[in-house]
């Protein structure tokens, strides 16, 4: 691995690239295979593939707005992504867990940013539901990576507090 003092934990960006590529390939696949809102049941009453476009943020927040939200969410994603790269670069050698968490969040943010900038919406295709009574909003691999990375960040904060260490950052 390159000199950690010079590059920080930037070599962990391979995870970011992997998340981005898997996210974009999966979105392209489901756009080619499914029509809008078509469902393919994978596990009855629990899990399906579907195709949905989200012009808003998480849970379709502001999706009904006139289009300005596309640029707002893109700007937020760019600022957050730049901040994550700086944070990643400043990590020390022993902060591997945190490096992986940041790389996951960054990969997901960039995957959804690409959709938003190029397509004008985010492509979602994973649908978790319970029978026909409850549906979680459709999501994608980028959203999953962001969620896993965020949980890892939260666990890192709790671990740091419990051991009496200063919070990473």
Swiss-Prot record:
Protein's gene: lspA
Main localization, broad class: membrane
Pathway stated in the Swiss-Prot or TrEMBL entry: Protein modification; lipoprotein biosynthesis (signal peptide cleavage)
Known outcome of mutating residue 143 to N: Loss of activity
Organism per entry: Pseudomonas aeruginosa (strain ATCC 15692 / DSM 22644 / CIP 104116 / JCM 14847 / LMG 12228 / 1C / PRS 101 / PAO1)
Membrane topology annotation: Multi-pass membrane protein
Activity control, per UniProt: Inhibited by globomycin.
GO molecular function annotation: aspartic-type endopeptidase activity; endopeptidase activity
Keyword match Disulfide bond: no
Catalytic activity: Release of signal peptides from bacterial membrane prolipoproteins. Hydrolyzes -Xaa-Yaa-Zaa-|-(S,diacylglyceryl)Cys-, in which Xaa is hydrophobic (preferably Leu), and Yaa (Ala or Ser) and Zaa (Gly or Ala) have small, neutral side chains
Periplasmic face residues: 31-67, 119-140
First-level EC class: hydrolase
Active site: 124, 143
Protein name: Lipoprotein signal peptidase
UniProt-listed Enzyme Commission number(s): 3.4.23.36
Cytoplasmic-facing ranges: 1-9, 90-96, 155-169
Biological process terms in GO annotation: signal peptide processing
Localization per Swiss-Prot or TrEMBL: Cell inner membrane
Oligomer status and interactors: Monomer in the crystal.
One Pfam family, short name: Peptidase_A8
Transmembrane domains' residue ranges: 10-30, 68-89, 97-118, 141-154
InterPro entries recorded: Peptidase_A8
Function of the molecule: This protein specifically catalyzes the removal of signal peptides from prolipoproteins.
Family: Belongs to the peptidase A8 family.
Keywords: Aspartyl protease, Cell inner membrane, Cell membrane, Hydrolase, Membrane, Protease, Transmembrane, Transmembrane helix
GO cellular component: plasma membrane
């Amino acid at each position: 691995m390159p000199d950690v003092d010079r590059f920080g934990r930037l070599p962990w960006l391979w995870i970011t690239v992997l998340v981005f590529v898997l996210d974009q390939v999966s979105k392209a696949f489901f756009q080619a295979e499914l029509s809008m809102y078509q469902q393919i049941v994978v596990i009855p009453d629990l899990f399906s593939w579907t195709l949905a476009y989200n012009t808003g943020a998480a849970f379709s927040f502001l999706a009904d707005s006139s289009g300005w939200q596309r640029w707002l969410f893109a700007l937020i994603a760019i600022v957050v992504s730049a901040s994550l790269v700086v944070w990643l670069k400043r990590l020390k050698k022993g902060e591997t867990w945190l490096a992986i968490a940041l790389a996951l969040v960054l990969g997901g943010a960039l995957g959804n940013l690409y959709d938003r900038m190029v397509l004008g919406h985010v492509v979602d295709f994973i649908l978790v539901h319970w029978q026909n009574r409850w549906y979680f909003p459709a999501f994608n691999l980028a959203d999953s990576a962001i969620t896993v990375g965020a949980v890892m960040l939260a666990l890192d904060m709790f671990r740091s507090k419990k051991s009496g260490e200063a919070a990473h950052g």
